[in-house]
Amino acid sequence: ADIESENLIKSIISSESTYPILAEESGKSSNDLGDVFWVIDPLDGTSNYNRDIPICCVSIGLVIEMKPILGIIYDFNNDHMYSGDKFSNISKMNDISINVSQKSDKKESILITGLPHNTDYSDSSLNNMIKDMQDWQKIRMIGSAAIAACYIASGKAERYQETGSYLWDIVCLLYTSPSPRDDEL
């Protein structure tokens, strides 16, 4: 499903744009990208998708000089289209404005995280992770960084934190959730 989705998205973008495309499945050398390029994750949450867990999506973004400028995340299980851009500083779900949470106290906030396959499970690493997690009201592991971006953009959670993520995993966190707190993500 990933490769079919990616090929379709690349075909559509290429018919309308000459900018290069960085895609999860086919990749592209960062040397070949230039200052402006598209980023595609054709199926974020593949493991969820493969097990019929309805937490997965398609994400597409435009990056200029390594800064996310605009993008969309399509949560096809719920027919929710999230969009955002740095020019308007407005995030939307199905053309309705959404807002990030105003909570700033971790004790009242939700952290979304994950444990990728290359996670360091040493005692010291796990102790540090547990210590950090104890500061939050709730911890959620949902299996999709892009869906996490949607939850943050719509105020359902306050922060996403995970090591080992790639650009196509996290670029949507920054442009679907424009806020003064972008630097915290």
Walk through the language-model features, giving the residues of each.
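DPxDG-like acidic metal-binding loop motif
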Residues: 32-87
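N-terminal low-complexity segments that are often proline-rich with Ser/Thr-Pro
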Residues: 184-185
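ATP-dependent small-molecule kinase catalytic core of the GHMP/sugar-kinase superfamily
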Residues: 76-107
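N-terminal subdomain of lithium-sensitive/metallo-dependent phosphomonoesterases centered on the IMPase/IPPase/PAP
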Residues: 1-43
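An extended, acidic
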Residues: 99-177, 181
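Residue-level signal for inorganic ion chemistry
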Residues: 2, 13, 46, 75, ...
